[in-house]
Amino acid sequence: MKLILASASSARRSMLEQAGIDAESIPAAVDEDMVKQSMRAEGASAAETATALAHLKAERISRRYPDSVVIGSDQLLVCEGAWFDKAPDLERARARLLDFRGRAHHLVTSVVCAKGGSRLWHHVETPCLHMRRFSEDFLNRYLAQEGEALLGSVGCYRLEGPGIQLFDRIEGDYFSILGMPLLPLLGFLRQHQALTV
């Protein structure tokens, strides 16, 4: 059975590749900002919104490829009730990291599998990350080292690189922090016979 990842995310694609999963990457055209604003206005939770976005992505691609299992995933960063999007530039990334310094935030991460336009399964994880009280000197070195690569992450960090040094404690699933609850997804795919067991 063919697997498709409804995402252009290099982190998600890399996770699947490293797990030995052959999935074609086909990004879904979804107006994420509009969906987030609409759901937030309706009082939806971050988990409901992340799942709706993941579902939209998987559903759109699964209608075009009805015989494939399509994986959609989305992640929202929540800090003290506020939702955050990716920083548009390094100046705002710096401000965000200073704002998160010494505080905890959550990465609400949802994955959905769809086939033929219908949702087959979904799963949500909400890891909690505690950012340490780092110095401005450390932050300046970190920003210089990582550069614009930080703008691809909603939290302005990559745990698989020097970004791990921003934290003193992490609670929850590592793969969910990277962008997709991989172990529950693998379990579903085996159960659905989309993977060899």
Curated annotation (Swiss-Prot):
GO terms for cellular component: cytoplasm. Its EC number is 3.6.1.9. One of its GO terms (molecular function) is nucleoside triphosphate diphosphatase activity. It catalyses: a ribonucleoside 5'-triphosphate + H2O = a ribonucleoside 5'-phosphate + diphosphate + H(+); a 2'-deoxyribonucleoside 5'-triphosphate + H2O = a 2'-deoxyribonucleoside 5'-phosphate + diphosphate + H(+). InterPro entries: ITPase-like_fam, Maf-like. Keywords: Cytoplasm, Hydrolase, Nucleotide metabolism. The active site is at residue 74. Its cofactor is a divalent metal cation. Its main location: cytoplasm. GO terms for biological process: nucleotide metabolic process. It is found in: Cytoplasm. Nucleoside triphosphate pyrophosphatase. May have a dual role in cell division arrest and in preventing the incorporation of modified nucleotides into cellular nucleic acids. Belongs to the Maf family. HAMAP family: Maf. This is Nucleoside triphosphate pyrophosphatase. It comes from Granulibacter bethesdensis (strain ATCC BAA-1260 / CGDNIH1).
